A protein has these predicted regions:
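Hydrophobic transmembrane alpha-helical segments of multi-pass transport and channel proteins
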Residues: 501-504, 508-512, 548-552, 564-568
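Core hydrophobic alpha-helical membrane-spanning segments
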Residues: 8-21, 476-479, 512-517, 539-543
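Membrane-interface amphipathic helices and adjacent TM-edge segments
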Residues: 214, 341, 411-477, 518-549, ...
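Transmembrane helix interruption/hinge and helix-loop junction motifs
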Residues: 395-397, 547-556
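Membrane-protein biogenesis/insertion across secretory and organellar systems
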Residues: 1-410, 580, 584-589
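Alpha-helical membrane-interface segments at transmembrane helix boundaries
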Residues: 384-395, 455-459, 463, 502, ...
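Conserved catalytic motifs of ABC-family nucleotide-binding domains
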Residues: 478-520
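Hydrophobic core segments of alpha-helical transmembrane domains in multi-pass membrane proteins
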Residues: 514-515, 555-563
Length: 589
């Protein structure tokens, strides 16, 4: 029985390490991108197939969904440059983005509250269209009379100005009585027949969602018919925000995702875009492209005809791959008819930013699940809520991990205490077990009978030593995904040399401390009588120290605190058991 208990503990540890490594490659791996030809400047090229197919429209879209003729360095040049005059610059407290007036696509987004890397002051680039990468948010009106389906190409919108900031915003009072600064960027396109299309982007200070609205004023003599579309288009370039450290490469999930009322969260890998195409209709759905810590998503909104109140519309959600291997997640609205002399408004929300669960949950059902904690999400969710609670009090994620670990140990204390008490008794009877092995070692049946009698007499359960580890492993794994998936912990410092809890310890100090605590903890456990088992258990602290060298510092911190509390708990229990045994022996003496 004792041998089986030790193998169970050893097996649980190896299974945990194996699951972590397997998860890196299985759920979060992705196919390596095919090499792409790069040029100094991305010029417009024919991607007509990138437009979604309109319903009931006897037209062929000869237009393009163009790439901005601009590089990242040129975007950072002066506003008076020839390139920047083609684009509309919008700067809020959260975004610095550029809109191409041809088609009204967002061709670059910089997230001002998130740095490119820990040691960089450059903002994280969410969307871009340059020699390195194509990743844009597109929208427009397609169909029979949609300007984006015109044979002459996508519409060139007129703009009032080419640079907007929050200084151009207006104060708006919401229904809850709060005042917000709201910035609206209008783009106008007029047809010779008298149809006016106003495409507007609305930004609210402090909020990531962008409202993209198309208003059609039909002053012509004929009925106008079209559909709104919104899509995210991305090439197969690598994730700029992925983690890659040491001998292990953390391949975070990069791919499509979508949700509907009856299927809240679904992944769709880029490699499966051709074989598992998304094509479904939903009211209240969404489409997204997910990467490490960040997500971009289209959420279809409301349709308003003439003076009627806006109502949510049923949108077609779809995925496809273009002729030039661009991955597209998008939606199209139903066909909209605007009789002569009337108007309509149709909108959608675009989210392009960090995966903040509270904000995503308010936007659409299931969108917050892009923060993917895997199959242990119920435990991970509780751990994250606990971390948030402590962080709101002390303002440091490292100390929050320590306090959360203490709380978890207190909750598990009664169960673990019972297990450690049994292990302490095993430690006390170890000499007697060794004597029995020497006496009955050749007779396995007699040895097993004597051992069972000893366990029963001393009220010892050798398998109970597995309980603490079995309780800790799900928490350990869940906390790993919390550290890897929660953008709140990205670049979060603790103290001293630990300036990023989601990355490995740069000096390997915490893993070495963890190895010491594991060694001390082993010394408090009953030692194996089998020489081979003893050798394996002696090298386990070394093995786990090597594993932990490349794990997030926050996870190693959790394990150190957990081991330290366990050592104290086990030491006191061992002393108590030894004292009780001495008290039993003394009267009989």
């Amino acid at each position: 029985m004792q041998q089986w208990a030790r193998f169970a503990i050893l097996g649980a540890m190896f299974v945990t390490a194996y699951l972590l490594i397997l998860a890196w490659q299985k759920d979060y791996g992705h196919v390596a991108p095919a090499p792409q030809q790069q040029a100094a400047v991305v010029s417009a090229h024919d991607v007509s197939a990138d437009l979604p197919n309109a319903q009931n429209a006897n037209t062929t879209a000869a237009s393009d969904v163009p790439q901005a003729n601009v590089t990242a360095s040129q975007l950072q040049a002066t506003e008076n440059s020839a390139v920047n005059q083609q684009l509309i610059s919008v700067k809020t407290d959260l975004y610095h983005l550029w809109i191409n007036p041809k088609g009204g696509d967002i061709v670059r987004i910089e997230l001002l509250s998130h740095d490119e890397s820990k040691d960089s002051e450059k903002p994280f680039v969410m969307l871009e269209s340059d020699a390195k990468r194509t990743y844009v948010a597109q929208s427009g009106l397609i169909g029979l009379n949609g300007p984006d389906s015109s044979r002459s190409g996508r519409p060139m919108y007129d703009v009032e100005k080419t640079a907007y900031t929050l200084a151009d915003a207006k104060s708006v009072t919401s229904k809850d009585g709060k005042t917000h600064q709201v910035l609206t960027v209008p783009l106008v396109f007029k047809t010779p027949e008298g149809v006016e299309v106003i495409k507007s982007f609305t930004f609210t200070q402090g909020d990531y969602p962008i409202t993209v609205k198309h208003q059609v004023l039909n002053r012509s003599q004929q009925n106008w018919q079209g559909q709104m579309f919104g899509q995210l288009k991305r090439d197969n370039s690598d994730d700029p925000g992925k983690s890659s450290q040491g001998i292990f490469t953390l391949g975070t999930y990069l791919g499509g995702a979508w949700g509907a009322p009856d299927a809240h969260y679904n992944k769709l890998k880029f490699s499966n875009f051709n074989d598992e195409k998304l094509s479904t209709e939903a009211k209240g759905g969404w489409v997204a492209i997910v990467q490490h810590y960040f997500v971009s998503a289209w959420i279809p909104g409301n349709l308003k005809l003439t003076q009627a109140d806006g109502q949510p519309y049923t949108a077609k959600l779809e995925s496809r791959q273009s002729a030039d291997h661009m991955n597209i997640m998008g939606f199209t609205s139903p066909v909209i008819n605007v009789p002569a002399g009337t108007s309509m408004e149709v909108d959608a929300k675009l989210y392009a930013g960090p995966k903040v669960q509270s904000e995503l949950k308010d936007l659409a059902d299931g969108l917050n699940q892009t923060v993917d904690y895997g199959w242990l999400w119920p435990i991970a969710k509780l751990l994250f809520l606990g971390l948030q609670f402590f962080h709101n009090i002390i303002g440091n994620w490292g100390w929050s991990i320590i306090l959360l670990t203490i709380l978890v140990k207190l909750i598990l204390w009664p169960l673990s205490a019972k297990s450690y008490r049994s292990m302490a008794k095993m430690r006390v009877i170890a000499p007697e077990m060794q004597r029995m092995k020497e006496e009955f070692g050749e007779d396995r049946m007699r040895f097993s009978q004597e051992m069972m009698a000893l366990y029963k007499r001393e009220q010892v359960n050798p398998l109970s030593g597995c309980l603490p580890l079995l309780l800790q492993m799900p928490i350990f794994l869940a906390l790993y995904w919390v550290l890897m998936e929660s953008v709140e912990l990205r670049h979060a410092p603790w103290l001293g040399w630990i300036q990023d809890l989601s990355a490995m310890d740069p000096w390997f100090i915490l893993p070495l401390i963890m190895g010491v605590t594991m060694f001390v903890q082993q010394m408090l456990n009953p030692q194996p009588t089998d020489p081979m088992q003893a050798k394996v258990f002696r090298i386990m602290p070394i093995m786990f120290t090597v594993f932990m060298l490349f794990f997030p510092a926050g996870l190693v911190l959790y394990w150190i605190v957990n081991n330290s509390i366990t050592i104290l708990q086990q030491w006191f229990i061992n002393k108590g058991v030894e004292k009780d045994r001495l008290n039993k022996v003394e009267p009989s003496a």
